Amino acid sequence: MKLAVYGKGGIGKSTTSCNISVALAKRGRRVLQIGCDPKHDSTFTLTGFLIPTIIDTLEEKDYHYEDVYAEDVIYEGYGGVHCVEAGGPPAGAGCGGYVVGETMKLLKELRAFEDHDVILFDVLGDVVCGGFAAPLNYADYCVIITDNGFDALFAANRIAASCREKARTHPLKLAGLVGNRTNKRDLIDKYVEAVPMPVLEILPLIEDIRVSRVKGKTIFEMAETDPSLEPVCQYYLNIADHLLACPEGVVPQECPDRALFELLSDFYSRTPVPA
């Protein structure tokens, strides 16, 4: 199974992805998480450090792909989850999307996809240009991380449009939304009423999740010494169980930008402002 996780920048994709990866590993699956972001910090909470990127390794090898081995680019993180970071070009130069495409090419040559039960792509923000949309060409399911706010749902809608486009030539389905750091879901419900898709889970604002990111640990690792965090782990196990059940998913039909803007902004305009 191949999963592509997208969402607005800063929404908590990487933290969520790492915890989903561990949850899948705890369900007995061999998991490979691939960070597709020039910041190369997707797998930080799994490994506890910024692992060398594929671009770093290729530079060391003078871009001789035949000299790159799996152990050069794949690192083992918490729970036995294997980790890869694509990396990116220097700031202001080159194309990060191209790097993602080359990463897919190298990992296929290394047969990394064949050695794992689940491949999880954690992809840069809501940028869905051709290069950063490349993981959708490989994915069985897309998962969108959002919150209960206008900007995140607007980004989710653009990602849904990319899923619909890719599904024309590839058997891709949108597994659904994960609400992150949100104590309300009224705007999420309004969106999925307009653009039908499953809501896999809603995670409230939990300070320990934010702290886990700073500490470079998954919530599962923190729960080993703090059993009170086990209910938090259950959110991610619920998502993992849903995905492992091979859900039917949907091919979404996104809302036109102007219609979505009116839909969501109308909600805010009708919400009473406290005195």
UniProtKB/Swiss-Prot annotation:
Record bears the keyword Nucleotide-binding: yes
Reactions this protein catalyses: chlorophyllide a + oxidized 2[4Fe-4S]-[ferredoxin] + 2 ADP + 2 phosphate = protochlorophyllide a + reduced 2[4Fe-4S]-[ferredoxin] + 2 ATP + 2 H2O
EC number: 1.3.7.7
Co-factor binding comment: Binds 1 [4Fe-4S] cluster per dimer.
Binding, [4Fe-4S] cluster: 95, 129
Keyword Lyase attributed: no
GO molecular function, one term: metal ion binding
Coiled coil start-end: none
Keywords, sorted A to Z: 4Fe-4S, ATP-binding, Chlorophyll biosynthesis, Iron, Iron-sulfur, Magnesium, Metal-binding, Nucleotide-binding, Oxidoreductase, Photosynthesis
Required cofactor(s): [4Fe-4S] cluster
Binding site residues for ATP: 10-15, 39, 180-181
Residues the entry annotates as binding Mg(2+): 14
Disulfide bridge positions per record: none
Pathway: Porphyrin-containing compound metabolism; chlorophyll biosynthesis (light-independent)
GO biological process terms on file: light-independent chlorophyll biosynthetic process; photosynthesis, dark reaction
EC primary class: oxidoreductase
Protein family (similarity comment): Belongs to the NifH/BchL/ChlL family.
Function summary: Component of the dark-operative protochlorophyllide reductase (DPOR) that uses Mg-ATP and reduced ferredoxin to reduce ring D of protochlorophyllide (Pchlide) to form chlorophyllide a (Chlide). This reaction is light-independent. The L component serves as a unique electron donor to the NB-component of the complex, and binds Mg-ATP.
PANTHER family referenced in this protein's UniProt entry, alphabetically: LIGHT-INDEPENDENT PROTOCHLOROPHYLLIDE REDUCTASE IRON-SULFUR ATP-BINDING PROTEIN
Subunit description: Homodimer. Protochlorophyllide reductase is composed of three subunits; ChlL, ChlN and ChlB.
Protein name as annotated: Light-independent protochlorophyllide reductase iron-sulfur ATP-binding protein
Origin organism lineage: Bacteria, Bacillati, Cyanobacteriota, Cyanophyceae, Gloeobacterales
Primary gene name: chlL
